[in-house]
């Protein structure tokens, strides 16, 4: 039993395999079914299970169902029986129209495994539609003179059915004049034609009617009918005639649309429709049909579109008058367009030259032509430009003009010109056109550079750093481009001794001036030179300007004491009688300053004194005077230190040291102090300078000596030791400059009474004031020495 059950199971598996193979093969085929249209819903189409060779339960187990691409369920599958049934009534004409055959494509979907079966359902046509004429009545107008055999086309009938159910033939009811003929066209549609069998006579039979029938090929056949009326048309034996065979009219081109241009008129001797006339344009061009319009009944010709004389000057129109019978007459209408001034002149530029060189006269700037498409005075034109321009218009051939320069232009005055060319016609009203053009003037190197100043004054403080920017010169050139690019240079100095190349330099591009080395006011107070400015034109133009450099003084020199000299030797000793009154002039400190201005203004003050309050120094002239009466208690020897200070910023100073001896009289010579003995050898050398300084004031000196002797005779005092004035040997500096006269010997005079130490007699030395002679632009000194003369005087006290 076990073996038998196993064998049975194997047989079932083999059968199932064959079934699956069969279903797979069936899924690749298309199953066709057919059904007639208009069948009720639920009608049987076919048994799917039987056709597929499947059992009904397999359709149920595999969930078989009908699907379609348009999602309309036109078929349904009964899974209990396997029958395909209609889900709705099918209308072939709605589904396929005139397409034959009408086939619907459906699919049967089965699952486990998934499988699609292609189904084609053909919907068969039934004769459910009759032929139909679109018009129930047809009207034919046939002239009575139509020949026998003439064919007249009739309207065809339409049948929604197809195939044998479509229109098959046409028939007409019996009559004595016509028979029906059917024409088949390439798409198998059939058209009826009416053929004249017997000549018509309007007077005998003005009208006849018959029935036109259309039959299809269905079973039973269906038909449709229409009434055909034939109206016999009387013969038209008179053609229309115009009142004039030729019409001519004029119209302005600016006439408004709808304007009446002309009324043409024709008549016809026939009556009825044969006498009714219709007016039309015959063989008219597209321009005529767009521009004019004719009333078919009244013959009025009106304006339909704007006219343009410049496009078309006249129109020739053939008017056709046609009667109801088809006969016609013709007339010609000539329409002349009158020109009006509706077009402004036109300017056409042929060539233009810009920019133009500024120095070229009679240069052609522009060539242009002018025109006005109007006629007569409307087309006559005049051309002009503004009168205040250096240009002129010259007429050339026909309507060509040239715009030329009237005189050489100056770019620096006007770099560009905006020229308005005005063209005006002579119509009424006058129309004009303006053309604006810009003419650029190119530069020519006709202007030399111009300095902003003819001369420049620069101030430089002395002791400047090398390469210091001391100022700038600037020149402008009215030209443009490279002609206006300026290079600066130093011109050779007029003073050949001026080392200009070592003093200043100039930047060739911007005119900046630089000091090449440090300047010294005391050596060079001012110098002049010329600078040149050259443009880069061809040929190059240049100009020059004068530059004056003033060196400003800096307080770089300390005051220098001329008297008493301070050279490290013993200070000079001054003798003051004890009988001197307050304000007695002891001596005068003479100092100079190599600077100038306020830097050389000197002031004096007593810095140190052995006995304060005994002597005083005048601040402005350096005079040392007694401040009070001398007494016996005052020391005989005093040491004074005088400070000499200038007015610079910061101030500089120097000191002068001198000794003062108080004496009762001059009866005994005063021996030189021990510390002054070594300077005796230098006294003679300085004496020469002192004599030179005092020679010019000898008369004043003698007067002072006499006054001094008179005072001494009146007041006798005890004699004091006599000292000598020790003057160091050495020349005075030659670079000293007197700036104001204060504290110097140039405007005040001073003398000194000295006793030589090597003689037992009293000697006076007369000194001439020192007057230095220093040039403004150089260094030097000129000292004049006068011979020293000695006179011996004996004083008995």
From Swiss-Prot:
Cross-referenced Pfam families: Cadherin (PF00028), Cadherin_2 (PF08266), Cadherin_C_2 (PF16492)
Disulfide cysteine pairs (residue numbers): none
Protein name: Protocadherin beta-11
Keyword entries, A-Z: Calcium, Cell adhesion, Cell membrane, Glycoprotein, Membrane, Repeat, Signal, Transmembrane, Transmembrane helix
Main location: membrane
GO molecular-function terms, A-Z: calcium ion binding
Glycosylation sites: 418, 436, 487, 567
Organism the protein comes from: Homo sapiens (Human)
């Amino acid at each position: 039993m076990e073996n038998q059950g196993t064998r049975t199971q194997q047989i079932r598996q083999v059968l199932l395999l064959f079934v699956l193979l069969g279903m797979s093969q069936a899924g690749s085929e298309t199953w066709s079914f057919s059904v007639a249209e208009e069948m009720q819903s639920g009608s049987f189409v076919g048994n799917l299970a039987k056709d597929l060779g499947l059992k009904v339960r397999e359709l149920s187990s595999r969930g078989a169902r009908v699907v379609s691409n348009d999602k309309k369920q036109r078929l349904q599958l009964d899974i209990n029986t396997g029958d395909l049934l209609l889900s709705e009534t099918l209308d072939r004409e709605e589904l396929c129209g005139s397409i034959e055959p009408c086939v619907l494509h459906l699919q049967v979907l089965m699952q486990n495994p998934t499988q699609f079966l292609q189904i084609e359902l053909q919907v068969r046509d039934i004769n459910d539609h009759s032929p139909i004429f679109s018009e129930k009545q047809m009207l034919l107008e046939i002239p009575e003179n139509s020949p026998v055999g003439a064919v007249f086309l009739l309207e065809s009938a339409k049948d929604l059915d197809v195939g044998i159910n479509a229109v098959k033939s046409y028939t007409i009811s019996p009559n004595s004049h016509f028979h029906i003929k059917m024409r088949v066209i390439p798409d198998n549609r059939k058209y009826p034609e009416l053929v004249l069998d017997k000549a018509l006579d309007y007077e005998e039979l003005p009208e006849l009617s018959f029935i036109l029938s259309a039959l299809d090929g269905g079973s039973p056949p269906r038909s449709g009918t229409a009434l055909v009326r034939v109206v016999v048309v009387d013969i038209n034996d008179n053609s229309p005639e115009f009142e004039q065979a030729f019409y001519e009219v004029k119209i302005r081109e600016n006439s408004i649309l709808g304007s009446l241009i002309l009324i043409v008129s024709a008549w016809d001797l026939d009556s009825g429709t044969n006498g009714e006339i219709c007016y039309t344009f015959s063989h008219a061009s597209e321009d005529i049909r767009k521009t004019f319009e004719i009333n078919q009944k009244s013959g009025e010709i009106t304006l339909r579109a704007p006219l343009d004389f410049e496009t078309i000057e006249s129109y020739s129109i053939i008017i056709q008058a046609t009667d109801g019978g088809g006969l016609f007459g013709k007339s010609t209408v000539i329409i002349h367009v009158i020109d009006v001034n509706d077009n402004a002149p036109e300017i056409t530029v042929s060539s233009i030259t810009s920019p133009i060189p500024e120095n070229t006269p009679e240069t052609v700037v522009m060539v242009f032509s002018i025109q006005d498409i109007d006629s007569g005075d409307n087309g006559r034109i005049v051309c002009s430009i503004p009168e205040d321009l250096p240009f002129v218009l010259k007429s050339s051939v026909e309507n060509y003009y040239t715009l030329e320069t009237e005189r050489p232009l100056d770019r620096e005055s006007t770099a560009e010109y905006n020229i308005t060319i005005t063209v005006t016609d002579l119509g009424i009203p006058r129309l004009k056109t303006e053309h604006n053009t810009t003419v650029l003037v190119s530069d020519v190197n006709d202007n030399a550079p111009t300095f902003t100043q003819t001369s420049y004054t620069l101030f430089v403080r002395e002791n400047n750093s090398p390469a210091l920017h001391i100022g700038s010169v600037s020149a402008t050139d009215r030209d443009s481009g490279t002609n206006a690019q300026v290079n600066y240079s130093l011109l050779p100095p007029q003073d050949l001794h001026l080392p200009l190349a070592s003093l200043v330099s100039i930047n060739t591009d911007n005119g900046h001036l630089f000091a090449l080395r440090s300047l010294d006011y005391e050596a060079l107070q001012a110098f002049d030179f010329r600078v040149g400015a050259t443009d880069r034109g061809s040929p190059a133009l240049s100009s020059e300007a004068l530059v004056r450099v003033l060196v400003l003084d800096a307080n770089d020199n300390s005051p220098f004491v001329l008297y008493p000299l301070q050279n490290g030797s013993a200070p000079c000793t001054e003798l003051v009688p004890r009988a001197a009154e307050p304000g007695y002039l002891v001596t005068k400190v003479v100092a100079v300053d190599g600077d100038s201005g306020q830097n050389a203004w000197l002031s004096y003050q007593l810095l140190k004194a052995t006995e304060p309050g005994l002597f005083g120094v005048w601040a402005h002239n350096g005079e040392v005077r007694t401040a009070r009466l001398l007494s016996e208690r005052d020391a005989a020897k005093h040491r004074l230190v005088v400070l000499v200070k200038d007015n610079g910023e910061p101030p500089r100073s120097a000191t002068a040291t001198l000794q003062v001896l108080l004496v009762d009289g001059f009866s005994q010579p005063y021996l030189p102090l021990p510390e002054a003995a070594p300077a005796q050898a230098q006294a003679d050398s300085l004496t020469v300078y002192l004599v030179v300084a005092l020679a010019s004031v000898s008369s004043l000196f003698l007067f002072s000596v006499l006054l001094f002797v008179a005072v001494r005779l009146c007041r006798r005092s005890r004699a004091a030791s006599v000292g000598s004035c020790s003057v160091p040997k050495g020349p005075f500096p030659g670079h000293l400059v007197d700036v104001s006269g204060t504290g110097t010997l140039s405007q005040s005079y001073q003398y000194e009474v000295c006793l030589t130490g090597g003689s037992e007699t009293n000697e006076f030395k007369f000194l001439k004031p020192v007057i230095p002679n220093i040039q403004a632009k150089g260094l030097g000194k000129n000292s004049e020495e006068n011979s020293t003369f000695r006179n011996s005087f004996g004083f008995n006290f």
